[in-house]
Amino acid sequence: MLRGCFLLLRWSILVAHRANGSPNPVNEHNKMVTKSAFLSLSKSDRFKTFLTRFQSFNNVTRRFVAGEDLADAVEAIRVLNQKGISASFDHLGESITSEAATREEVNEYLRVLDSIEENKLDSNVSVKLTQLGLDVSQELCYSNTRRIVESAAAYSNFVRIDMEESPKTDATLEIFKRLRNEFENVGIVIQAYLYRSVKDIEELLKIGARIRLCKGAYNEPAAVAFPEKADVDANYSKLTKLLLTSGIYHGLATHDENMIAAAEQFARELAIASDKFEFQMLYGIRRDLQEKLVREGYRMRVYVPYGRYWYPYFMRRLAERPANIWFVLRNMMRG
């Protein structure tokens, strides 16, 4: 196991080091192999134990995760707000199978909403339904999520429901639509790498849904998702145009400068004002680009994760961008 981990790390150094070079089929294939490997490792307790032996690794995770406590996330968001950047709290945790544990997650999100109000933060919240009981029962999950959305409504705040692996998509959309029938302060995430997403967006726009569009970060089979990055990018651009012409306020979640430039150009061509949508990015990734977009007059929201269960989230971030792997490895070697 550990020998395989070391070989993967050596491979990742090579792929990450070349990540900023000119794209070609070989490089893109290598990136896809690396992504698949890191997504598999995101579920490995043994690999987590191996990595967390290194203090330098634990230190570098703070680049991408605000900390383990709510106070850490509050401070991180306060700093972002001072730069003109909005935020979205995410208490890390997923695949919870205990009803009691799902209640604890609800209580944590109620604390988050109280804290946003008390600290006058420019932030909403993001939730994963597997945190809130989706793997226990759909009705429990709906009830738990409704409590959070109702509490947010009392503060005139907003709740974004994250999308997880494709087997969860139908149930996630069903719960969202039930909530949207009662509340306006709830939105959903759609993943551009899924073939079904164009039809899902068309249906969601009919009910006025506010959508965060992302590319997708899970390891999906070719039967349900585009396997090639070029196809994902093309679909992301297509869906971006669909959202921007809907007249509804949406979020475009990407760190890809080509996707951002295409969205900017499309908005200019159709005279869509910069305050009619927002760009969204992840905490600690492309901070230079986040601040640049704000200076140019665009709205920017950063997804700020915190909590003890940071490992799967962190590994997915490494899987998404080889440059992140290089950053982590370089800092570990310095430590």
Please name every model-derived segment.
Residues V15-A19, V26-E28:
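Acidic, Ala/Val/Gly-enriched low-complexity intrinsically disordered segments
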Residues A19-S22, Y155:
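Compositionally biased non-globular segments, especially hydrophobic aliphatic-rich helices
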Residues N27-G335:
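Positively charged, amphipathic and often flexible ligand-engagement surfaces
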